[in-house]
Amino acid sequence: LGLARHELGRTVWDERHLCHSPQERLFIDGAWHEGLLPPEDGPALRQQYQRFAARVAQAQRLGFALPTRQARWTPEHATLDAQTFAHWLDQQALTHPRLRWYLDYCCRDDFGADAATVSAWAGLHYFASRHGFHALGDETAEREPVLTWPEGNGWLSARLAEPLREHLHLGRVVLRVTERKHGIDLLAWNEAAGAAERWEARAVVLATPLFVSARLLEQPPDALRVAAGQLHYAPWLTANLALTGELLHRPGAPAAWDNVRYGAASLGYVDARHQSLNPSPRPPLLTAYVALPAARRRDLLEQPWQTWARWVLDDLAPLHPDLAPQLQRIDLCRFGHAMSVPVPGLRGSAALVALGEARGRVLFAHADLAGYSVFEEAYAAGMKTARRVAGGLGLAAG
Ligand SMILES: Cc1cc2nc3c(=O)[nH]c(=O)nc-3n(C[C@H](O)[C@H](O)[C@H](O)COP(=O)(O)OP(=O)(O)OC[C@H]3O[C@@H](n4cnc5c(N)ncnc54)[C@H](O)[C@@H]3O)c2cc1C
């Protein structure tokens, strides 16, 4: 995609796509602070940060990778997978409220659920598969680059799809997938024609969430039935807020790409114009993110948009008391099953492994196969399955 090139053994990223500085800030104790890690309020917190950093370094020696299935799976991993992250942290006496808030935030941001819900494997994977964890001032290596686009990961999927444009049949919702003796029948709803249509295929890759795949297949394999029963999905709400003018400056660090309030129910907001290279001033466009507990899925569906708009504005008000009067337009998007939550036992699920390794004419490729949801996992699942299908059909895979 032209995002990176290799020069003298180093990866050099195209700076237009790297998150511009300042990247993150946290509103705590009445002021903005650079970064999302709460500032130290005494030696007890520093000591806890350092102890957690040491535990993450230990976990890295055990082996964590992104995509996760590139790492080996040992009994130690299984032990971590069998308990919640909160339980594991309690056992380690890592209980400082500021550390726990930060770890909860990371889990809600990446997994859609807090440390009391996700497994200890997931909580450690967040750090150990990437840059580790460093107390303030202890950062050694350069941070891993963050790529971001105003349209989010839609930028990536649009460019990955571009070379295949002629082969894509969009605007169709698959209703049924039936394996026959010599092929596969698909029943799809064609949105433009307003009619159902039948397709025949030699092979099918179900790149749909596993709970959807389980409903599409007339005869889902046992592993799919089991896996679909093990998955828990987090509902999410996003809100795009178009403002009429700049917000008042609060004390501390300047506006960043990601802006979070300590203790908030939401995950804060990103500035959708942060990457803009257009020098002429334009009013802010903010995207707020909310990961809700599964118990609130029905509310998300049933409560009117005004209720959720109010919820978002109330949540952001302590950051920007002048936000509501500046609001020109708000666009809300509800995701009933936004991402699979890595609850205890899920990463080690034999059913997920079996689906990822499935042979035959119907194969599976979705981030769900990793037990949690990030772009890298979706990409890895897609590539792996594409190669297998191509091999089975005697085609070359790119
Ligand atoms: C609000 C939000 C923010 C996120 N932010 C990040 C981030 O910053 N970084 C990151 O790495 N990940 C992020 N994620 C997670 C990321 O979006 C997912 O990991 C990724 O989209 C998974 O890709 P996938 O191809 O496996 O599945 P999906 O993106 O779920 O794609 C499945 C596709 O199947 C289609 N489909 C479903 N049913 C049918 C049917 N019956 N017929 C036809 N098509 C069907 C769907 O429309 C969808 O297009 C975020 C997720 C959310 C919800």
Residue ranges: model-predicted function:
Residues 1, 6, 82, 88, ...:
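Conserved beta-strand->loop/alpha-helix structural units within folded catalytic cores of enzymes
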Residues 1-61:
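Dinucleotide-binding Rossmann-like beta1-alpha1 core, especially the glycine-rich loop
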Residues 7-27, 173-177, 226-229, 255-262, ...:
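Polar, surface-exposed loop/tail segments
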Residues 29, 35-37, 183, 189, ...:
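Conserved flavin/dinucleotide-binding core of flavoenzymes
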Residues 53-62, 128-132, 142-150, 234, ...:
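Flavin (FAD/FMN)-binding glycine-rich loop and adjacent Rossmann-like elements that form
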Residues 64-176, 180-183, 200:
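Active-site/ligand-binding neighborhood in enzyme catalytic cores
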Residues 172-173, 178-180, 186-254:
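Central helical "cap/lid" subdomain
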